[in-house]
Amino acid sequence: SQQFVVASSFDLPIESNTQDVVIQVFAPGSSEEYARVLKAGGLLLTVDPAPMHLFELKSLVYDNPAKHAVEKEQRVGFEQTLDETVNYPLHFDNDEQKIALIKMTPYYWRLPPDRLAVIVEKLNHVTVDFRVQAWLKMPETA
């Protein structure tokens, strides 16, 4: 059976060596905690922003926007089996779609209403840019 759990990835309410798959999407995580809960051969799938993720929006929010930093990751006890980027433009049909996207970001909570209106007016599309990685938990050695 499948069960989905939402919790702090640094202190998962899950027994050790019981999970076949752990999925981490746009959140910090603990390799040690993932290694604890995954069975040997279990899969850790991570999705993080790649350099150009929502860059057009960031360019309207900040004077000097920075690209997301992407670093080569090492996870002790894991073997990386996938490191791919998913990248595509996302065009908007109306202002409601723009506002819905902005509300899903931390930028929304910092924007005064007048600034939000300007951004909605100027934003035509954004780049969706994800980094998807898969890691297999290696068998423990004595």
Language-model regions: role of each:
Residues 1-12:
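Conserved SAM-binding strand-loop segment of SAM-dependent methyltransferases
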Residues 9-10, 29, 48-53:
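Short, acidic/turn-prone active-site loops that include or flank metal/cofactor-
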Residues 10-22:
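A short acidic, Gly/Pro-enriched loop at the edge of an enzyme's catalytic core
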Residues 20, 25, 47:
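Residues lining the SAM
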Residues 29-45:
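A short glycine-rich, Lys/Arg-flanked "PGG" loop and its adjoining helix->strand segment in the class I
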Residues 43-76:
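Conserved class I S-adenosyl-L-methionine
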Residues 65-99:
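Active-site capping/gating segments
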Residues 86-142:
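Conserved Class I S-adenosyl-L-methionine
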